[in-house]
Amino acid sequence: MKTTHITEQKFADLGLEPTVLEGLDAQGFHYCTPIQALALPVVLTGQDIAGQAQTGTGKTLAFLTATFNYLLLNPASDERKTNQPRAIIMAPTRELAIQIYNDAAPLLASTGLKAGLAYGGEAYEKQQKVFAEGVDILIGTCGRIIDFYKQRVIDLASIQVVVLDEADRMFDLGFIKDIRFLFRRMPAPKARLNMLFSATLSYRVKELAFEHMNSPESVVVEPNQKTGHLIQEELFYPSNQEKMRLLQTLIEEEWPDRAIIFANTKHRCEDIWGHLAADNHRVGLLNGDVPQKKRVRILEQFTQGDIDILVATDVAARGLHIPQVTHVYNYDLPDDAEDYVHRIGRTGRAGESGSSISFACEEYAINLPAIETYIEHPIPLSKYNSEALLDELPAPLRLQRTPRQGGNRRPNGNRQGQGQSRPRNNNRRHPQSQKQQ
């Protein structure tokens, strides 16, 4: 039975270079997602594209497939030097750059092409060594790429393919001047294949595309609704005093297999982490203060199931491919309505269902009208029974301390995942047909 997120378009029918198809087959990719089915037939002809689709729809595989295919069918010039990559893939964050590199691994193995990573937060020497040996594909963030360019570690004169991923996020983070700097150091747009992908093709993104690309064709996959039809949304109005107790109560009732909790500040994230760690949850923290190597390790632990809950600022809300996230909690409603969509888009991916639970607290309830206007529907409201919330919670741990192993309130002293923690209070939720006025 065909699932809703896969089309009838086969990769085998696209005329791909055999070793590219081999890499796709090795990972079980046989049918295209909608963005792949629309983008690949266009870009494989050599036409530049500007693609838009919801997160989790296969944008990364689309541009990786096109990049590898183009490089294999269009050999490098004889004048190319060792420090000149043939393709460059730019991402707004270190985490996304690493994710793209990991996603490229099967194609690297099947084609024999080489790739290198360039991002901040890690020592220069290790990355420099890779580029000194020569790579075909450069994947990285703009700041470190510019550093390497100015130090002559890399040269962009032989670039044949350019990919700009999460272009709208590039604007949000103020990287557009860096991108334009790099574009001006590459061959002219007509001398290379250019691909831009974004969650939204806003006016400023389109302007960038037409300025530095060769008449790109727009490829748009419109969602059924901005928040995704497989995501069950829910909203609570907690007081500031009950907010943490409500979160911990919901977590114990739901026992999410894999959850992300978003907060608006790093200090709030640390506070949430401290409460959950003290309660012996397997929880990780991801914010701007966490060293890069630790961030990578935390993401790996979360992806592999060694961590059940990830507490994060919006650094984790865009671009990362974390499979099977079952729940997203907006502990704080985001200030930007678009960030609400990107946050809850961590769940309900690739045809799976998911749950999004948001708190409209005293501090951030003011953001709710703009969010509901942007998503074009009210978030279903639920009430809760204050008397049913957990109490006598342990004091939160400080970030520098190691979470203790003993002293759990639950029977058997650990999470069993089979309803052994606390009976579900069926009176906790009282769904409302309309949002409170």
Curated annotation (Swiss-Prot):
Residues annotated as domain Helicase C-terminal: 245-390
Primary role: DEAD-box RNA helicase involved in RNA degradation. Has RNA-dependent ATPase activity and unwinds double-stranded RNA.
Short motif DEAD box, span: 165-168
EC identifiers of the protein: 3.6.4.13
Extent of motif Q motif: 9-37
Gene Ontology MF terms in the entry: ATP binding; ATP hydrolysis activity; RNA binding; RNA helicase activity
Record keywords, A-Z: ATP-binding, Cytoplasm, Helicase, Hydrolase, Nucleotide-binding, RNA-binding
Low complexity: bias regions: 400-424
SUPFAM superfamilies referenced in this protein's UniProt entry, alphabetically: P-loop containing nucleoside triphosphate hydrolases
Family to which the UniProt record says this protein belongs: Belongs to the DEAD box helicase family. RhlB subfamily.
GO biological process: RNA catabolic process
Protein name as it appears in the record: ATP-dependent RNA helicase RhlB
Gene name of this polypeptide: rhlB
Reactions this protein catalyses: ATP + H2O = ADP + phosphate + H(+)
Record's subunit section: Component of the RNA degradosome, which is a multiprotein complex involved in RNA processing and mRNA degradation.
Main location as per UniProt: cytoplasm
Region (Disordered): 395-437
Compartments it resides in: Cytoplasm
Recorded GO CC terms: cytosol
Keyword Transcription listed: no
Native organism: Photobacterium profundum (strain SS9)
